[in-house]
């Protein structure tokens, strides 16, 4: 397979076992700051996906709430394949802490009573949301918290 510019295109998606959180890449800036990009994989690639209303609400809830748990978050974005999200941190390389931040954020999702910015002024597709769908996705991921570190399903 020819090496491609996009890191995830070089990942053999048939070898990973969701759910997991993995360091997908790092980038150092000119002043020494380092961006750490994590792959938060909720669903098994090419086997499952998150339905759009639940995924969309989960994106809003996570993007808003994750920043309550870390001031190092640069961005949280959904994957187009609808199997997960990317989250990027600046100058924060503690993998176990990232797992704890994601866990706390997903617990916020479970406790949410509304989806933030779920209106036509603040959202580009305000009609496509499901708070209950987001909670279902979050709960399923939290239920497998002990598997998040095991990207390839080796049990290690």
Curated annotation (Swiss-Prot):
Any GO BP annotation: quorum sensing
MF (Gene Ontology): iron ion binding; S-ribosylhomocysteine lyase activity
Function: Involved in the synthesis of autoinducer 2 (AI-2) which is secreted by bacteria and is used to communicate both the cell density and the metabolic potential of the environment. The regulation of gene expression in response to changes in cell density is called quorum sensing. Catalyzes the transformation of S-ribosylhomocysteine (RHC) to homocysteine (HC) and 4,5-dihydroxy-2,3-pentadione (DPD).
UniProt-listed InterPro entries: LuxS_sf, Metalloenz_LuxS/M16, S-ribosylhomocysteinase
Keyword Lyase: yes
Keyword Amino-acid biosynthesis: no
Pfam families per record: LuxS
Record's cofactor remark: Binds 1 Fe cation per subunit.
Organism listed in the record: Staphylococcus aureus (strain bovine RF122 / ET3-1)
Entry similarity comment: Belongs to the LuxS family.
UniProt EC number: 4.4.1.21
Quaternary structure and partners: Homodimer.
Protein name as it appears in the record: S-ribosylhomocysteine lyase
Coiled-coil portions: none
Reaction equation(s) it catalyzes: S-(5-deoxy-D-ribos-5-yl)-L-homocysteine = (S)-4,5-dihydroxypentane-2,3-dione + L-homocysteine
Needed cofactors: Fe cation
Keywords from the UniProt entry: Autoinducer synthesis, Iron, Lyase, Metal-binding, Quorum sensing
Residues annotated for Fe cation binding in this entry: 56, 60, 123
């Amino acid at each position: 397979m020819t090496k491609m510019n996009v890191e995830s295109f070089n990942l053999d998606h048939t070898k990973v076992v969701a759910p997991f959180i993995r360091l997908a890449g790092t980038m150092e800036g000119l002043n020494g700051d380092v961006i750490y990009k994590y792959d938060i994989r909720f669903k098994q690639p090419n086997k499952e996906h998150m339905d759009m209303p639940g995924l969309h609400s989960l994106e809003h809830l996570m993007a808003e709430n994750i920043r309550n748990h870390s001031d190092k978050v640069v961005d949280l974005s959904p994957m187009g394949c609808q199997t997960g999200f990317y989250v990027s941190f600046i100058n924060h390389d503690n993998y176990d802490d990232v797992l704890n931040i994601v866990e706390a954020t997903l617990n916020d999702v479970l406790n949410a009573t509304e989806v933030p910015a779920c209106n036509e002024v603040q959202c580009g597709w305000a009609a496509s949301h499901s708070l209950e769908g987001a909670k279902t996705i979050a709960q399923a991921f939290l239920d497998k918290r002990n598997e998040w570190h095991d990207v390839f399903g080796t049990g290690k």
